[in-house]
Every structure is written in C-alpha cells, then in structure tokens.
Amino acid sequence: LDGVQVVGVFSRWGKVAAATTATELILKFKVQHILFTGIAGALDDTLNVGDVVVARNFYQHDMDARPLMPRLQIPLLGKDNFSTKPEDTQRGVEAVKKFIDSDKDFLRKLHLAGLSKPAVYAGDMASGDLFVSSTKMRNSIRKNVPSALCVDMESAAVAQVCEDYDCPLT
C-alpha cells in the first residue's frame, strides 16, 4: 500500500479472538504498527451513525476482579487502560478527515440523502465481551467508563497485546 507492506486480517469477534490475531501479527508477520478498525456503538450522545472515533485510551469495561483490585484494573499490571501515542492518534484523526474529504461523490450522496458528513473524534474506547443491546447495559458502561465515547468487543484486548509486545497501535 503506497510502497509499505501491509497485512490485512479479520480477527473474529471478541477480546480473545482479537488478542490472538494481534499476537499472530506481531510474532509471525513482525508487524511494526497495528492499525485497528472496526464497528463500535455510541456511548456518547453527541455521536451519530457514521462518525469515526480514533482512540486515545482503551478500557476493558468488563474487567472486574473486585475485591482484589478496583473495577477496570488489569490484574498484575496496576493500570486500568492502555493508551496510544498522542502523535499516532493525531495522525489517525488527520488521515480519516482527509479520507472523508477526498470522496466528493460520497459527500454529495450524503447531502442528497439529508445526512451530514461524518465527524471525526479522538477519544476513549470501552471494550468487553458483551454485545450492548439495551439502554441499561449502555448506561452501566457509561457509569464505569465515563470518558468512553463508544464501545466495541475487541479494541482494548488488541491494545493490551500491543503494549505487552511494545508494538504501536492506532
């Protein structure tokens, strides 16, 4: 892709499947950076369908080893989230905006359909092995991870593997 070797994969659903795939990419393919993309559900009311969130921090919203440690804290690591490098997040935001703005036909079709151009945010993600299908579940995650803009089932596991193997993640 533009002179850079790229490995594209589908990890399957869930944290374990995503972690397995990330580990394979790092160990077998010797990737130097992982660009994670996927589908997420909005936790923040300002997000609309089609908006893009480039992650700053990843939380496992279903991590709960209380009373041994606080909710969200990853056992033996003493932390509750995994962060991207700020410059990688910013580069990701800029790339997504450039990509969206480059497709004039797509933007025209959105306008004709009465839809707005997707907004791009840098923010926090919450991941867990739960499909969030109710307001009650959504509110529970928002309560436990108030900074999270959206929720998925894989990204925090990939972030943990990337940190374990010192592989940058965007």
Where does each model-flagged region fall?
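N-terminal short beta-loop-beta anion/metal-coordinating cradle
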Residues: 1-29
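A short, Lys/Arg-enriched amphipathic alpha-helix followed by its capping loop at the start of a domain
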Residues: 1-4, 161, 165
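Active-site nucleophile and cofactor-binding loops and adjacent substrate-binding regions
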Residues: 11, 149-153
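Short loop/turn motifs at secondary-structure junctions
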Residues: 30, 48, 121, 166-168
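Structural motif
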Residues: 33-35
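Mid-sequence, gly/pro-rich, charge-dense loop/helix-turn segments that line enzyme active sites
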Residues: 43-150
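Zn-dependent metallopeptidase/amidohydrolase metal-coordination segment
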Residues: 156, 162-170
